[in-house]
A protein has these predicted regions:
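Non-catalytic beta-sheet/beta-sandwich ligand-binding modules that flank or precede catalytic cores
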Residues: 1-220
Length: 220
């Protein structure tokens, strides 16, 4: 993230000096936003700092919500003229006026595991639908997502692409028993599998495989 300084309104680029403290750029990423702080070791007409996307940061088009000089610092030009402690951003000169950065730091999660099959007793060879719903569209690649059922069977969910739901069919086999079918524990990825959302760059991994309370097959 870069800030350019000019001499007056509509003037030419001007070198300034951050004498102490920090020059703080607050980005609109939801909530209180994220602040990029530039330290006092620069002199020039442009100052820049790095923004690292954090968990739960979101923005449909990243912009700067505020500028401030922190740590009792000052910014002055070569003539000693001091910049306001809370500089205003000129109209049309914000980050989102020049760039279209979309931020999605929200990792996908499991919403529920349900079944569309009727509540009844199933015997050997009968099929039961199992549907897993995610908080956003995800892609399962390379290997399966495994659901351990309380009937003693591990149900594999096959790889799929760009969907917020995935389907699997459980066939009851000999010696399978359950008074009320449910997934035990949390689903797990088979070796080499990845489960990510569908961002164009740097997709977010699903890392919390917890099934929310009241959202298991047996709860419906």
């Amino acid at each position: 993230v870069a800030v350019s300084f000019i001499n007056g309104v509509g003037g030419a680029a001007e070198n300034v000096n951050l004498n102490s403290g920090t020059f703080d750029i607050t980005l609109a990423t939801g909530g209180a936003g994220r602040t990029v702080s530039i330290s006092s070791d620069w002199n020039g007409s442009t100052a820049s700092g790095d923004y690292v996307v954090a968990v739960n940061d979101v923005s449909s088009k990243l912009s700067v919500s505020g500028l401030a000089i922190g740590g009792s610092g000052t910014v002055t030009d070569t003539y000693g003229n001091e910049l306001s402690a809370t500089p205003a951003i000129p109209v049309g000169a914000n980050l989102d006026d020049a760039e279209n950065f979309q931020i999605d730091g929200v990792a996908p999660t499991i919403v529920s595991i349900t079944s569309s099959s009727n509540d009844t007793t199933y015997g050997i060879g009968d099929d039961i639908n199992v549907t897993i719903t995610f908080s956003k569209a995800v892609t399962l690649a390379t290997a399966n997502l495994d659901l351990v059922l309380n009937s003693g069977y591990t149900l594999p969910v096959a790889p799929f692409s760009a969907s917020s739901t995935a389907q699997a069919t459980y066939e009851v086999l000999a010696d399978h028993q359950s008074a009320d079918l449910a997934v035990t524990g949390s689903p797990t990825l088979a070796g080499g599998a990845t489960l990510k959302d569908n961002l164009n760059f740097f997709p977010n991994d699903l890392t919390d495989f917890t099934i929310p309370a009241g959202q298991n097959i047996s709860d419906a």
